[in-house]
């Protein structure tokens, strides 16, 4: 599980959006050796944005049908049932999403990314709007997905949230990668120490 770690404005979301082709960029981006602009690559990754992109008038079930059919997924309904139960949204699935709280909308965004059975999951600040119990459930879900072979890239500025689950971290500052750390290589230092040693503390307010 790979983390893009950096203060607000470091370029984490820009990086995620570039990978998903939501922003124009210079150079080449490849996923498993395949250009990210190719249809195969696009079908292979799921994207969970920081701010959920949903249709206010559609219900959860209608969103599921729209995404499942757009991606031509075979078992999307069964997966949707699984994640709706996991996120405790059973009694909300017939409601228009405009009636849902911010945290619930974030959960809907997650389940829509997961019902396509992505090989790669790109997650931008996933804990925004979630209560502590939901954060723990989400972390456990990411660990389970990793064990199932899903490659996960998470951007965050909150170190403590990802401390227990990360394997590899790229620390960003001012649009650049300033450090790359593997958990297995850490000895006496913590990821938090490396983070603060790598970024310019005078210009950013850091959340730990």
Range-by-range predicted roles:
Residues 27-41:
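Conserved ABC transporter NBD signature motif
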Residues 132-134:
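Helix N-cap at the start of a conserved alpha-helix in ABC-type nucleotide-binding domains
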Residues 156-157:
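H-loop/switch region of ABC-family ATPase nucleotide-binding domains
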Residues 121-125:
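Catalytic Walker B motif of ABC-type/P-loop ATPase nucleotide-binding domains
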Residues 65, 69-92:
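Conserved ABC ATPase "signature" region
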Residues 96-100:
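Conserved ABC ATPase signature
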